[in-house]
Structure formats: C-alpha cells, structure tokens
Amino acid sequence: MSSSLFAPTIETIDYPFPPKPVPLSDAQKADYKARIKQLLIEKDAVLVAHYYTDPEIQALAEETGGCVSDSLEMARFGRDHPAKTLIVAGVKFMGETAKILSPEKTILMPTLEATCSLDLGCPIDKFSAFCDAHPDHTVVVYANTSAAVKARADWVVTSSIALEIVEHLDSEGKKIIWGPDRHLGSYIAKQTGAEMLMWQGDCIVHDEFKANALRDLKSVYPDAAILVHPESPASVVAMADAVGSTSQLIKAAQTMPNERFIVATDRGIFYKMQQAAPGKTLIEAPTGGNGATCKSCAHCPWMAMNGLKAIEASLSNSDKTTHEIFVDEDLRVKALIPLTRMLDFAKTLNMKVKGNA
C-alpha cells in the first residue's frame, strides 16, 4: 500500500480557452491542403501530428509522409527524418521536446498559443522551489511539461514507461517527487506501492471524465470494454477493462475481442483507433453527467487550434516569430539528460517508449 504525500495545492487556474478555428468550406480545405503539400516540399519540411489533433490534420500528416503519434515519438520521428524543418501539430511542450532532440532543425508550430493545462499548472519557479525543499528526493516528471521543468528533473517519463521507471527507483530505495499529473501519479503509486510526493496538476480533458455517468453508459452497453487513460480520476480508472497510454489504448481496441469500446481519453484518438480496429464501435466516455456541463468535452481546446489555415501560415509566413520554437541551449542540454535517461532505460527493457504526451 502506498503512502503518497501531496504537494501544497497551487491556486486554481482559470484556463483561458482559445477560440476555435473558423470552420472552412470543403473548397477552402482542399485549397489549404494542396498549398500545404506544396510548401512542405518547397521548405524541405515534414508534418508530425499528435493523436489528439483533429482527424483531417492526422490524415494530412499521413498523406504527406509525416507521422501521427504521441509527443515523444513525434520528436524522435522528426529527429530521424531527413527534413530540415519540422511542423509540429500539437501543443507547445511537444515543439520544445522536438527542439531538445533536434537542435539543428527548424521547429515550427501552427500556433505558439497552443498550450497544456499540465504545463500551465506546473510553473518552473514554484516546482523548482518545491524540489529544492526536498533535496533527498529523485525528481520524476511527465513528458507533458515545459523544457524548464524537464531540465529540473532527474527523469522524464511517458505514461507507457512510468510504472517501470518508478518501480525501478522504488526498488533502489529512492524517495520520489512526481509531477505534474496527480491522477497519473496516484495510479502509479497504487500500482507500484512507491512513496511519492506529488505535485497537484491535472489534464483538463481527462479530469472531466465522470465515474457515475460512465457507470450509466456501461449499463446501456454492457458488452462494451472500457478503455481509460491513467490521467483520468481514480474512480474512472477503477472501472477500466484496460488502462494505458494512447498507443496502448489503440492496441487494446485492436486486440480485445469486444465489438464496442467506451473510450476515456481525448476523442482525437478515434481517428487512429478506428484505423486499427475498423469493424469496431467507439463510444466517447462521458465528461458531464447529472446535468453537469463539460469545459473540454473530451477534446483538448489547444489541440483544436492546429487547423489547416494555421499550418499553412506556419509554412508561408516569412516572419516566423509567431511559429518558431526556441529553447535556450543550456536548458536544452539539461533537459536532454533526463530524456536520454528514459530512452536508455527503455532500451534495457527492450521496449519502444510510447506515451500519451
């Protein structure tokens, strides 16, 4: 049984949700896609998109020889691809991770305003002070963090390898600081028995899944398997037939015998999940329930900012200040250390690291 301790609660953040991109007509979409395809060739660029972006963006990445995956695989694909420029359709920390692994490349994003509640909820000054107050602890941070927070950490982990790394550190008798996702941290502590001092951040999408409403939905579809990302509350995770990272949930939909799945993660994943399990029915897990309203409604508002118009602008604008990612070199070198530590650990386990981030 774990005896996890919690960090002092940081003040509640009222996240400023961005406006959604203006819907485009089919003709406009076709024009933007054609223009983007041409610009990718002209600029020696490749498009990498996260599982949580809109389906048409994921499809465009696939059509143009790019990549659709989690943030770390996006960064690794970009590092290993010969293109000199990477267009990262995702949120800002993903662009930073790509820059950390590919400092010599130009990293562009459709918008630098696309952020993440986990990143916003873990400001480096407060997190660093918290770590300084517990110098005997090993600092483990989730990949969904800023370059500065990664640079302050001993280990960076994705959701698919977090259990193994925490288990390893616990077996060595290490005390652990975990940040920033409290739900994922609680899940790991419960699974491993490790004592973890936890930062109190959460993902606005996963935090909204409701156990009571999920129970009601399950009664409507009793034959459906419930797939849950561990950034969800413990009450939701407890109902899962499979818990895992984005890649692991896609694999579960593909391999489990059920014909129906209730999916508790960002609905952007349905595009690749349906590809992997073409004959199966995917149902969104409820984020409201009992008259409650949802804020994110199972889709990250910042991921939704990655529209065709913004991607075209990132490639065509001569002024890159609103699109290009820069990471201070000293910070980059420091952040690369815990990232490399994770990748090396994964090699010893002979596993390919995929996570949510």
From Swiss-Prot:
Pfam families: NadA
Keywords noted in UniProt: 4Fe-4S, Cytoplasm, Iron, Iron-sulfur, Metal-binding, Pyridine nucleotide biosynthesis, Transferase
Binding-site positions, iminosuccinate: 50, 71, 142-144, 159, 229-231, 246
Main location: cytoplasm
Enzyme Commission code(s) on record: 2.5.1.72
Cofactors named for this entry: [4Fe-4S] cluster
CC terms in the record's Gene Ontology section: cytosol
BP terms from Gene Ontology: 'de novo' NAD biosynthetic process from L-aspartate
Species annotation: Shewanella oneidensis (strain ATCC 700550 / JCM 31522 / CIP 106686 / LMG 19005 / NCIMB 14063 / MR-1)
Gene name in the database record: nadA
Family: Belongs to the quinolinate synthase family. Type 1 subfamily.
Pathway entry: Cofactor biosynthesis; NAD(+) biosynthesis; quinolinate from iminoaspartate: step 1/1
Top-level taxon of the source organism: Bacteria
Xref: InterPro entries: NadA, NadA_sf, Quinolinate_synth_A_type1
Localization (cell): Cytoplasm
Protein name: Quinolinate synthase
SUPFAM superfamilies: NadA-like (SSF142754)
GO terms of molecular function: 4 iron, 4 sulfur cluster binding; metal ion binding; quinolinate synthetase A activity
Comment on bound cofactor: Binds 1 [4Fe-4S] cluster per subunit.
Enzyme class, UniProt record, top EC level: transferase
Known function: Catalyzes the condensation of iminoaspartate with dihydroxyacetone phosphate to form quinolinate.
